[in-house]
């Protein structure tokens, strides 16, 4: 991701295009809970977000103080048009409607590159720091994050690098995830060894059966 300055405007080149954002935008809409978590940690207020399936630790955003802008999969375009946001932050779930969102306000695509998970997360955090003039807070945030990762990796190493298997259960479907996947940080960042080195890399994981688990 490339960030350039034009006066008080940041020009951010991302995977889907270009976002021209005024520094410290006031009306911010977030469609990614990872980005919301980061903004919350940096003390950046947001105007709106999807209020379905909000993680428990971000439950305060269920408050009426925040506008409901639809769901992660189905943005409420009418509400967004009404809000006239200064910045819309999205990730992979909204990729297909990027063009429509970008007509309603500068839209920044902050997806994670699972093949380089940790570095990708840090880059996204630093971009948010640039937008909201929170560079110092970002340095502290990332230092704390790196310390926590190092502490977990030390425990993993001390345990003899144990194996792990990450699965997702959705109705009757069970999917396994390996390195370089959406849950690949368990292996690539925290240092666990995948119990099955042949798990195929897929956005939705590799379909498995109960027999596979046995």
Describe the residue ranges of each PLM region.
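Bacterial Sec-exported substrate-binding components of ABC uptake systems
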Residues: 1-33, 136-165
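Acidic/histidine-rich, surface-exposed loop or edge segments in extracytoplasmic proteins
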Residues: 13-20, 60, 106-109, 126
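Solvent-exposed coil/turn segments that connect beta secondary-structure elements
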Residues: 15-17, 33-34, 44, 51-52, ...
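Extracytoplasmic/secreted envelope proteins and their assembly/folding machinery
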Residues: 22-25, 32, 36, 40, ...
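A short, structured surface patch at a secondary-structure boundary
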Residues: 27, 32-79
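Solvent-exposed, acidic/flexible segments
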Residues: 29-32, 73, 91-94, 114-121, ...
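Binding-cleft/active-site segments that stabilize strongly anionic ligands or cofactors
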Residues: 61-110, 155-171, 175-214
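Extracytoplasmic substrate-binding proteins
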Residues: 97-171
């Amino acid at each position: 991701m490339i960030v350039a300055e034009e006066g008080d405007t940041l020009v951010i080149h991302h995977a889907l295009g270009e976002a021209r954002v005024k520094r410290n935008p006031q009306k911010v809409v977030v469609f990614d809970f990872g980005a919301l978590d980061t903004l919350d940690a940096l003390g950046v207020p947001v105007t709106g977000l999807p209020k379905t399936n909000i993680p428990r630790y971000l439950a305060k955003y269920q408050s009426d103080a925040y506008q409901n802008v639809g769901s992660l999969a189905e943005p409420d375009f009418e509400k967004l048009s009404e809000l006239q946001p200064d910045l819309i932050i999205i990730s992979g779930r909204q990729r297909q409607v990027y063009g429509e969102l970008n007509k309603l306000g500068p839209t920044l695509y902050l997806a994670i590159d699972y093949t380089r998970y940790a570095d990708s997360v840090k880059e996204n955090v630093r971009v948010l720091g640039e937008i909201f003039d929170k560079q110092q807070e970002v340095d502290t945030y990332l230092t704390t994050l790196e310390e926590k990762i190092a502490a977990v990796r030390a425990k993993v190493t001390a345990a003899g690098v144990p194996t792990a298997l990450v699965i997702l259960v959705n109705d009757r479907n069970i999917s396994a995830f390996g390195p370089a996947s959406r849950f690949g940080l368990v292996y690539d960042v925290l240092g666990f060894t995948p119990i099955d080195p042949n798990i195929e890399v897929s956005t939705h994981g590799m379909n498995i059966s109960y027999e596979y688990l046995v």
